[in-house]
């Protein structure tokens, strides 16, 4: 079995000089968690396998600040770095990779123009392109016979709807079908975030995580809802994820990455210590 990856996620807002890491619940009510470069250094030293930076302001004025944050981080950190947020052009990808990122994460731009995945994968390689999918449960299955219906923990049937613009806009697109299409177009990984779970500390959304892990051949990164090491264990054991992304439990010092990895190792999950 391949080693499972632990990936801290840093949601970076560029509303002040140098950027700031924040964390909210269901993408709102943001509270500050620290300087992105300092946090990245800490996670690197603590044994993180990779890092994800998401520019959640992702505005035109913010792009240069983000490039600066990436360059400063790449000087200090020597594990793979994925950067996402508002990336919608080949030139933006080129700038971010040149600044020191190893991968980029595309989300809204890919939903609006799926060929963007193929174009960027053809130019930079599938290993550089992560398709981020934000999704919400939708229990209206009667009017959606063409959707992939899953059974929730309590037995309720539901499908998962792709949402874009940081969770603010529903698309009517089925998350399972979209993930399969992203793989076909050349995405090297899927970063799956449950909007229902984001910031709730209630655990990953297992039904959708497991479904994508079973249906796709590329790695699935589970995201949204981690409150303790048990949730990460369940993401691997029940959700079959290849990697676990978490934010709050690391940013505010509740658990160290090393503690989480020891917990997983004791439960026979292969991790890099």
From Swiss-Prot:
Compartment(s) of residence: Cytoplasm
SUPFAM superfamilies hit by this protein: Ribulose-phoshate binding barrel (SSF51366)
Record's catalysed reaction(s): 5-[(5-phospho-1-deoxy-D-ribulos-1-ylimino)methylamino]-1-(5-phospho-beta-D-ribosyl)imidazole-4-carboxamide + L-glutamine = D-erythro-1-(imidazol-4-yl)glycerol 3-phosphate + 5-amino-1-(5-phospho-beta-D-ribosyl)imidazole-4-carboxamide + L-glutamate + H(+)
A molecular-function term among this protein's GO annotations: lyase activity
EC number: 4.3.2.10
InterPro entries on file: Aldolase_TIM, His_biosynth, HisF, IGPS_HisA/HisF, RibuloseP-bd_barrel
Active site as annotated: 11, 134
Listed name of the protein: Imidazole glycerol phosphate synthase subunit HisF
Organism of origin: Methanosarcina mazei (strain ATCC BAA-159 / DSM 3647 / Goe1 / Go1 / JCM 11833 / OCM 88) (Methanosarcina frisia)
């Amino acid at each position: 079995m391949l080693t499972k990856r632990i990936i801290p996620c840093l949601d970076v807002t560029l509303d002040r000089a140098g950027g700031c890491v924040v964390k909210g619940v269901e993408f709102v009510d943001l509270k500050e968690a620290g300087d992105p470069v300092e946090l990245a250094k800490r996670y690197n030293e603590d044994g993180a396998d990779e890092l994800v930076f998401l520019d959640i302001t992702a505005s035109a004025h913010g792009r240069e600040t983000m490039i600066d944050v990436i360059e400063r981080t790449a000087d200090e950190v020597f594990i793979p770095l994925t950067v996402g947020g508002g990336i919608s052009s080949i030139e933006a990808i080129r700038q971010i990779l040149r600044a020191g990122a190893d991968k980029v994460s595309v989300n809204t731009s890919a939903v609006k123009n799926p060929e963007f995945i193929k174009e960027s994968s053809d130019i930079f390689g599938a290993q550089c392109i992560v398709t981020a999918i934000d999704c919400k449960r939708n229990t209206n299955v009667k009017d959606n016979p063409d959707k992939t219906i899953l059974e929730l923990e309590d037995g309720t049937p539901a499908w998962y709807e792709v949402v874009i613009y940081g969770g603010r806009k529903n698309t009517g697109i089925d998350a399972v079908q979209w993930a399969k299409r992203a793989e076909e177009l050349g995405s090297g990984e899927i970063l799956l975030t449950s909007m229902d779970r984001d910031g709730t500390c209630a655990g990953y959304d297992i039904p959708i995580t497991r479904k994508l892990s079973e249906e796709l051949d590329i790695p699935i990164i589970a995201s949204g809802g981690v409150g303790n090491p048990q949730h990460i264990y369940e993401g691997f054991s029940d959700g079959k994820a290849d990697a676990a992304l978490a934010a709050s439990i690391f940013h505010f010092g509740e658990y160290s990455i090393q503690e989480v990895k020891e917990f997983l190792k004791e439960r026979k999950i292969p991790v890099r210590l």
